[in-house]
Amino acid sequence: MINLIEEKKEAIKELCIRFNVRRLEIFGSAAAGSKFDDQKSDIDFLVEFGPLKTGEYADTYFGLLEALENLFNRHIDLVMPRAIKNPYFLKSINQNRKVLYAA
């Protein structure tokens, strides 16, 4: 896992609590630590939210996305596990995913 993530673990935890995150994982080059470009690479997160009221999902999802982009000052890909339909993509994610937060 890249140092940038390690340095911001406490801030990540605070965002997870604020946005009712049940589980947040990192995957991709930032998780693997290889081929991550400090200047250009995005960061890929897998997120599961706790129970939310109808109509709160969009605000919560986009609020967390914006907060993570502000925290890391770079593009963030925020993926929900149930949205993954491609088995090859899921296999790729599973090869290097790491838990950052679990409630």
Whereabouts are the PLM-identified features?
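Catalytic core of pol beta-like nucleotidyltransferases
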Residues: 1-25, 31-38, 50-103
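Short hydrophobic/aromatic beta-strand micro-patches
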Residues: 46-48
